[in-house]
From Swiss-Prot:
It comes from Phenylobacterium zucineum (strain HLK1). GO terms for biological process: translation. This is Small ribosomal subunit protein uS7. HAMAP family: Ribosomal_uS7_B. Keywords: Ribonucleoprotein, Ribosomal protein, RNA-binding, rRNA-binding, tRNA-binding. SUPFAM superfamilies: Ribosomal protein S7. GO terms for molecular function: rRNA binding; structural constituent of ribosome; tRNA binding. GO terms for cellular component: small ribosomal subunit.
Length: 157
């Protein structure tokens, strides 16, 4: 544990186009080397593609549906008990759920095969909103791991 005091949570401002805090967080995860304008163009470009491809839902609804489908409810954490390390399933706090979902979506998008990051991100968001894709698979794997280690759930802290 750190001996210092806990770091304060920084407030992020809502994004200019949709006025959504989660979209700003998402942009910050997409951003490289402080290039916010580039990240903004990528995310808004992906939202434009979503709007064109998916007529039944708006881009913001598709984005939030994708996040909900990727967010894990439970994960495993290592716990050392008497020389043995157990993978103990624990519930995920809401803030961490959202952070993991965003991280998994961005990483899954980066590893896709399309040409531009805008297309990759739009494709992954579309897949995740309809419960497919690498990010959803990552969530399923996490849940499977927690289910497999359910016997150790009494070691929860």
């Amino acid at each position: 544990m750190s001996r210092r005091r806990r770091a304060d949570k920084r407030e992020v401002l809502p994004d200019p186009k949709f006025g959504d805090l989660v979209v700003t967080k998402f942009m910050n995860y997409v951003m490289y080397e402080g290039k916010k304008a580039v990240a903004e163009n990528i995310v808004y470009g992906a939202f434009d593609i979503l709007e064109a491809r998916r007529k039944d839902m708006g881009p913001l609804e598709t984005f939030h549906a994708a996040l909900d489908n990727v967010a894990p409810a439970i994960e495993v954490r290592s716990r050392r008990v008497g020389g043995a390390t157990y993978q103990v399933p624990v519930e995920v706090r809401p803030e961490r759920r959202r952070a993991l979902a965003i991280r998994w979506l961005v990483n899954a998008a980066r590893s896709r095969g399309e040409n531009t990051m805008t297309e990759k991100l739009a494709g992954e968001l579309l897949d995740a909103s309809s419960n497919r894709g690498s990010a959803v698979k990552k969530r399923e794997d996490t849940h499977k791991m927690a289910e497999a280690n359910r016997a150790f759930s009494h070691y929860r802290w």
